């Protein structure tokens, strides 16, 4: 299965020597999708030997510096790397993302040899589905922060079940294009008889569901958007002792993050976007402990810069 999630950075506010700013990249069947792009994101791509030329889309949650200041560098990098990019780059984000980037491109006289397609989100007006093809779709959800902010859902569509050769032979379905069409989910007419994919395919395989959520205050409604998701990467900026500060700044504690995923019955929860004050491992493990106490039956882990998660059946395995 070619579905990987790469953790490029896990910090908030400013980059540290061992913790870059929060950014996540999905590799899916030869295409890449980047979520947030703070300062030094391109350094993470280089360290993890990830091709920036394969990035099809960049999705920005909100226009705060720690989530967008690496964007111009990525745009420049794509233009300077051997002039090989042919496909346009799609950039998605709240209103203002186009003005931010185009102003910088103009002021710095950045030369780019490819097109940029902008899709600006007008919260509560823009249709929730931002992108869709035969295998997947990307949606946004409204978050509660000090400025317009969205979370992103990456939803893999259900895949056809296993092909039953014996059933195909019993129905006299010849090998070749007809079988392939049925495997792709299309009905066919054979000898004046309609044959459905369900006639020769097993139960459909459920697609995986992934969510990226940062920065936001606690909201009961948030859980409704991520019900039974396989993996949710969610901000855990503060320890519970700073819950009032989290509330004031419209952020989450690790405990509140776990409360959200517990209510949604999320299978795996990855904590991310740690406050710069937490520089010691013991601080991060305290965040993890607080989350596990809230959701003891959930699979919860700390994300780390350089971590790679690989899809394996109905879950993601840390590599």
Curated annotation (Swiss-Prot):
Protein's name in the database: Ribonuclease Z
Chain's role: Zinc phosphodiesterase, which displays some tRNA 3'-processing endonuclease activity. Probably involved in tRNA maturation, by removing a 3'-trailer from precursor tRNA.
Binding site for Zn(2+) 1: 62, 64, 145, 215
UniProt: Zn(2+) 2 binding residues: 66-67, 215, 273
Active site: 66 (proton acceptor)
NCBIfam families assigned to the protein according to its UniProt record, in alphabetical order: PRK00055.1-3, RNase_Z
Cofactor note: Binds 2 Zn(2+) ions.
EC number: 3.1.26.11
Domain of life: Bacteria
Family, as annotated: Belongs to the RNase Z family.
InterPro entries given in the database record: Metallo-B-lactamas (IPR001279), RibonucZ/Hydroxyglut_hydro (IPR036866), RNase_Z/BN (IPR013471)
PANTHER family: ZINC PHOSPHODIESTERASE ELAC PROTEIN 1
Obligatory cofactor(s): Zn(2+)
UniProt subunit comment: Homodimer.
Catalytic activity field: Endonucleolytic cleavage of RNA, removing extra 3' nucleotides from tRNA precursor, generating 3' termini of tRNAs. A 3'-hydroxy group is left at the tRNA terminus and a 5'-phosphoryl group is left at the trailer molecule
CDD domains for the chain: RNaseZ_ZiPD-like_MBL-fold
Top-level class of the enzyme under EC nomenclature: hydrolase
Key words, A-Z: Endonuclease, Hydrolase, Metal-binding, Nuclease, tRNA processing, Zinc
Organism of derivation: Borrelia turicatae (strain 91E135)
Gene Ontology terms, MF aspect: 3'-tRNA processing endoribonuclease activity; zinc ion binding
